[in-house]
């Protein structure tokens, strides 16, 4: 990363990726954050912006030692 990269506007895909990584980190740490639902909505909006989708669902699961964040994207035909 160069000094001038600081002033470049991030693409929405990069912002969505960063938010997803942040959500995963908080979910793994079992830390509740107040804006997690807002971040999930933002992620859904970015997916809908770039894909022709019918619906998008995001849910988190925890089984024993494994925690997952599941993203289900239903595409239009």
UniProtKB/Swiss-Prot annotation:
Q: What is this protein called?
A: Cell division topological specificity factor
Q: Which family does it belong to?
A: Belongs to the MinE family.
Q: Which gene encodes it?
A: minE
Arranged from A to Z, the UniProt key words for this protein are: Cell cycle, Cell division
- Which Gene3D superfamilies does the record associate with it? Cell division topological specificity factor MinE
- What Pfam families does the database record attribute to this sequence? MinE
Reported function? Prevents the cell division inhibition by proteins MinC and MinD at internal division sites while permitting inhibition at polar sites. This ensures cell division at the proper site by restricting the formation of a division septum at the midpoint of the long axis of the cell.
NCBIfam families noted in UniProt: minE, PRK00296.1
List the GO biological process terms: cell division; regulation of division septum assembly
> Entry's InterPro entries?
MinE, MinE_sf
């Amino acid at each position: 990363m160069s000094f001038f990269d600081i002033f470049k506007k991030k693409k929405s895909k990069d912002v969505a990726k960063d938010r997803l990584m942040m959500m995963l980190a908080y979910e793994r740490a079992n830390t509740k954050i107040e804006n997690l639902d807002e971040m999930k909505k933002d992620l859904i909006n970015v997916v809908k912006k770039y894909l022709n989708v019918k619906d998008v669902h995001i849910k988190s699961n925890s089984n024993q030692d494994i925690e997952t964040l599941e993203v289900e994207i239903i595409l239009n035909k």
